[in-house]
Amino acid sequence: MTALNRFVKWKTAAFAAVAVATLASTPALAGNDNDEFQFDLVSSAAFLPHAHGRVNIESVGPVEIMSVTVWGLPPNTDFDFFVIQVPKAPFGLSWYQGDIETNRYGVGFERFVGRFNIETFIVAPGPAPAPTPHLDQPFPDASSNLATAPVHTYHLGLWFNSPKDAEKAGGKPNVVTPFNGEHNAGVQVLNTSNFPDLQGPLSRVKPTP
């Protein structure tokens, strides 16, 4: 490893430690201005009681920028991040937002751009054929959708990408969920159950002109 690489790794670790300490001491729901909103993610896995996260959503007109920091998680582990209808099972309608990978300190960060506000919803005016690239059990793709009126999805959840990683961290063995790209994820570890089911945090974000 070169001196430059060592310096970059040291700076990254130091920044992560400072960021976590700062976030942990910042009151929840405190935004910097009217266009920002901050809130916590809380542990949903009993075997990881110290897992935590902080979300900052900044409204910038046509889109929002959602910055997610998580800590207290297993190091060097992949997780999958979803926007969901309700924070706990059965979760309702859900859509795959992206991945978060922790570093060797169990800290992860990712930034997402999209619509994350009171207007966030899923709609299916009618049934239609759907592609089926993933057919493995226990959660094969559906070949068509059900019709639904607009359903708002105001909650967030984070899942282990691998059931084996969840088991290694102390979870029950062989628990598989559909919450990753191949539909063979582990259990949920963080969510927004600190908000009511029908009043998830995204409902408090108003789009800016």
Regions picked out by a protein language model, each given a short descriptive name:
Residues 2-14:
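Bacterial N-terminal signal peptides that target proteins for export
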Residues 12-23:
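Hydrophobic helical h-region of N-terminal Sec-dependent signal peptides
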Residues 25-27:
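N-terminal signal peptide c-region/cleavage motif recognized by signal peptidases
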